[in-house]
Amino acid sequence: MIRLYIFLVICIICLSCENNNILDFTPRKTQVAIQPFGQFPNDVLKEVQAGIDSIYDIESTVLQPIDLPKQAYYRPRNRYRADSLIRHLKRIKSKEYDKILGVTTSDISTTKGGYKDFGIMGLGFRPGKSCVGSIYRVQRGTINRKHLISRFRKVTIHELGHNFGLKHCTFDSKCLMQSAKGKATTIDKADEILCENCRQQIKHVLR
């Protein structure tokens, strides 16, 4: 009788495991949320998503647009503080995502050297949970839509790389983790790749 009882319990547990996929040991990929601020071009969003998914072998999700936070606005220069946007993104990030990338068409800035408010294309802390990119400065000097998208994909991949722990690359001049030094033309010279050295550095943080 006891043996029959034990057998029935085991059967119930096995059925329960099957129904709830408890035996599914498929590794979960790193999850990244892409958060548009305000109206943002859909074609650029799709390309950004495809770019970061491909380079980092992750799964990203485009969220519904939200307004830029008022507390990040810097009235004297009519732009938004990137560090404030990053903190805001970190606060609102859902636990289901490992990182969150904010994208905007508005100008963004940060404090750099002797400049209190320095206009930038993107910002990401190393390591970090959130980063932000803007097409406002990226679009300057572009010859067509394809050129703009290529530049912005590199910017977002670069800032996300900082979140994953990467420093500016000094090993390969074609690696997109090279420092742009504030120049969009530097971004154009880089390939949309991570060099082998950078790849090895983040292998342990990506699933």
Language-model region placement:
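Metalloprotease/metallohydrolase-associated module, dominated by Zn2+-dependent proteases
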Residues: G38, D117-R151, K167-R207
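C-terminal motif of bacterial Sec signal peptides marking the signal peptidase cleavage site
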Residues: I13-S16
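Metzincin-family zinc-dependent endopeptidase catalytic domain
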Residues: L45-V155, K167
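Fold-level signature of zinc-dependent metallopeptidase catalytic domains
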Residues: F25-D43
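Conserved phosphoacceptor histidine of two-component systems
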Residues: H158
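Bacterial lipoprotein signal-peptidase II cleavage site
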Residues: E18-L23
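Active-site-flanking alpha-helical
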Residues: G161, G165-L166
